[in-house]
């Protein structure tokens, strides 16, 4: 393994109250090397420069601790995980988590399975599938303490994909840019319909950077109606908005 300067990431994580062991640091470095290697064969990320990956992928993923700190034995699902952000990074930092990494592209699942094996991680699985299908009863529905997502979608759409996975009393956390705060008002109807309630929207800057981020935290207060999520494509084409209206009726008829 090549030698890397770890001072910056260690300082960044200290700002979040996270201290990594030598083993965890080694896992993150190996994760980085695998990401770059596999990215040469398939498009996993546009960000491959070492310091950028540390800041924009690893540190950003672990910023979850700004709003909550998962405990040992908690079950977490990452919807639309891509190359494993934030879910795999959270698993490394919090090894007691039980993590499911969900993505619709099989090539990403191949990378994730290779990374899980190489990093020697337990209680983590990569699942090839769509949120609309995996949220069916008897699979992942309402079986998780936390659902996280950095997927690029509006908050109403993400809520429909993610809230069905969260058990009552659990949390859905959406990783958004500084523009995420503007989506919150439009998404509150969707949150309510899906059994959620906005807990907080936290804006911050990643340590030693000008990168503005927003974590939107939604608490699951009641079960999601069985008709959600709707069939593939509808949550993004016709997101739940405003009052019970034309868009929602069209999508569920």
Regions found by a protein language model. Give the residues of each.
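Conserved SAM/SAH cofactor-binding pocket of Class I
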Residues: 62-153, 159-160
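Helix-to-beta-strand junctions that scaffold the AdoMet/dcAdoMet cofactor pocket
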Residues: 94, 166-168
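Conserved beta-strand signature within the Rossmann-like core of class I S-adenosyl-L-methionine
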Residues: 169-182
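Class I SAM-dependent transferase core
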Residues: 1-77, 107-110, 114-124
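Short loop/edge segments at beta-strand edges and connector loops
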Residues: 48, 128-130, 200-202
């Amino acid at each position: 393994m090549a030698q890397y300067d770890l001072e910056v990431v260690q300082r960044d994580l200290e700002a979040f109250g996270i201290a990594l062991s030598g083993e965890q640091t080694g896992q993150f470095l190996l994760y980085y090397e695998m990401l770059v290697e596999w990215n040469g064969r398939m498009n996993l990320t546009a960000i491959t420069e070492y310091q950028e990956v540390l800041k924009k992928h690893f540190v950003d993923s672990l910023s979850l601790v700004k709003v909550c700190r998962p405990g040992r034995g908690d079950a977490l699902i990452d919807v639309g995980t891509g190359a494993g952000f934030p879910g795999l990074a959270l698993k490394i930092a919090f090894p007691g988590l039980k993590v499911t990494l969900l993505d619709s592209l099989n090539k990403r699942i191949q990378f994730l399975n290779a990374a899980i094996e190489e990093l020697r991680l337990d209680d983590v699985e990569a699942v090839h599938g769509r949120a609309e299908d995996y949220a069916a009863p008897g699979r992942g529905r309402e079986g998780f303490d936390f659902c996280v997502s950095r997927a690029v979608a509006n908050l109403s759409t993400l809520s429909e994909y993610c809230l069905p996975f969260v058990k009552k009393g659990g949390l859905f956390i959406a990783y958004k840019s500084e523009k995420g705060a503007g989506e919150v008002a439009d998404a509150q109807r969707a949150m309510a319909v899906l059994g959620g309630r906005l807990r907080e929207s936290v804006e911050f800057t990643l340590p030693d950077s000008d990168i503005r981020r927003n974590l939107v935290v939604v608490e699951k207060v009641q079960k999601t109606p069985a008709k959600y999520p709707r069939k593939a494509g509808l949550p993004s084409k016709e997101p739940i908005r405003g009052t019970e209206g034309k868009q929602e009726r069209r999508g569920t008829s």
